[in-house]
């Protein structure tokens, strides 16, 4: 999906370049926070990935509760848990990621992609950023 088509579908908007987390991504991503952390404990943001962009393997740790929910909103992308096959993502799909599961997500090679990222509240939560998804791993997924 090209950028012009994507922008028509991406109802939550591109947001700003995701510079604070750029070191954990291959390619460019954008962040549009939808909730104000000063007003609620539930953080929701629209995350947009340019074609080929993906985040590093990472883990949302929690003693209890925690994890992340991805709600796919535009374009097409990938989600993969360690040791499992990648899942092709399209608008309307919801991925529930339990706490303490190593995973990554991002755009397909030839498509922009966005999802809402919902950080699930929990006890003693933290994020651990791990190694990048290699080009070899990513290229095996195809289009």
Where do the language-model regions lie?
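A short, N-terminal "cap"/entry segment at the start of jelly-roll beta-barrel domains
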Residues: 1-43, 127-143
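Short, conserved beta-strand element in jelly-roll/cupin
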Residues: 46-50, 61-79, 118-121
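Short beta-strand His + acidic residue motifs that chelate non-heme Fe in jelly-roll/DSBH
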Residues: 56-58, 79-80, 97, 102-109
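Short acidic-glycine-tyrosine-enriched beta hairpin
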Residues: 83-99
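A short hydrophobic beta-strand segment most commonly corresponding to one strand
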Residues: 96, 110-129
């Amino acid at each position: 999906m090209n950028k012009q088509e994507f922008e028509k579908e991406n109802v939550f908007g591109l947001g700003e370049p995701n510079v604070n987390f750029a070191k954990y991504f291959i390619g460019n991503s954008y962040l549009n926070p939808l909730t104000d952390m000063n007003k609620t404990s539930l953080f929701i943001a629209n995350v947009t990935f340019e074609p080929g962009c993906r985040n590093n393997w990472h883990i949302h740790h929690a003693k209890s509760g925690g994890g992340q929910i991805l709600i796919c909103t535009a374009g097409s992308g990938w989600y993969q848990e360690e040791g499992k096959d990648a899942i092709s993502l399209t608008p309307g799909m919801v991925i529930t990621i339990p706490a303490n599961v190593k995973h990554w997500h991002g755009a397909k090679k030839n498509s922009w992609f966005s999802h809402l990222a919902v950080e699930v509240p929990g006890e003693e939560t933290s994020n651990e950023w791990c190694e990048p998804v290699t080009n070899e791993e990513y290229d095996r997924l195809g289009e």
